[in-house]
Amino acid sequence: MSVDSFSSRISRDFQPDGALAAAMPGYVCRSEQVDLAGEIAGTMQQGGLLLAEAETGTGKTLAYLVPALRCADKVLISTHTKALQDQLMYRDIPTVQKALGVRRRVALLKGRSNYLCPQRLEKSLQDVKTEPWARRSLLRVNEWAGNSRDGDLASLSFDAFAAGIGSRITATAEQCLGSKCSHWDDCPLVKARQAAQEADVVVSNHSLLLADAQLKSGDFGEVLPDFDVTILDEAHAIPDLACRQFGRQVALSRLTTWHNDMQAVLEGLGDEAELKRDMTMQFMRVNEAFEADKLGEVLVAWQELVAGADARRERSTETAKLADRAEAIELDIEAILTPPKGYVAWRESSGRAATHLLAPVETGPVLGEKLWSRASCFILLSATLRISGSFAYAAERFG
């Protein structure tokens, strides 16, 4: 379909006698909405990047949903908040599909902390050191998991993280064993990603999009499939999220999680009591150096743990993964101690908890390299993009 004919068709949908008015009670045709939808449709057909500010009341959601659901392209709709994700998935998209008489396959893909990790649930239940209060909650999760269709923790009857067991039943990217996991075939996250691969339209979030851009730029795999069209609602949040995603973070909690995971694996092996004891003593040195805010000494002490983990790399899939995680932490500490060109390092603290961070000084260049260079047209929308009526600052931050 030509650019003009596609844009004309989209325009007709918004008219007082169009598809939306016929199917949606109370619909009012607004010229600003029609114009925005036309701009979006044109960009989708011609390619490129559209940066558009849509003030509250413009109706930007309909302005991008109609062309997104009318086109034949594979589309990603990314948001900053879960509330908007749910609104799109369960209210807006079904309503617009019905109004237009179209039936595109739609999938929702969330971050990994929203999905049950069967392997970590199993390990937590098998751990004899699991506290009675935690075991009770874990058993409730286990019962729910047997009946859950998708393993999305949103359908759990209680908040697992508020109950103190969230980290025991989910896996971070560092903890995930990937295709080597014994639960790969029944993993809720894998199934959600497969559904996204097969869908015409995927609803997701900015953090996941940026994580995917980071992985693809380094040839380390992918989180999301490739898309012809990427629509970023609530786009104003992208630059700040990019600072975090394309930087590095080292907190004592991250190091402690690694140590606890390593201890659990060594305990399971049954014949590594000496290494288990040595690592505990070495981690105490890491902990002391971190609390004394001596990151250089943290690095030296941590390298001993890296060596210990690497020496046991071949013992199991889990020890190999832990060795990789230890090396990744080592590289992050080194980068923070000696920031590469274009990056800045700093320290944040909350009470006694400190985090050392590294981030790009300017987000524009890194977004240009890792995101906008991809073979997809991009549509960036927000109610707040201009400053003093100008897009100049936003354009600089977006690259």
Could you tell me what each predicted segment is?
Residues 56:
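The conserved Walker
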Residues 50-53, 76, 379:
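Short hydrophobic/aromatic beta-strand immediately N-terminal to the Walker A/P-loop
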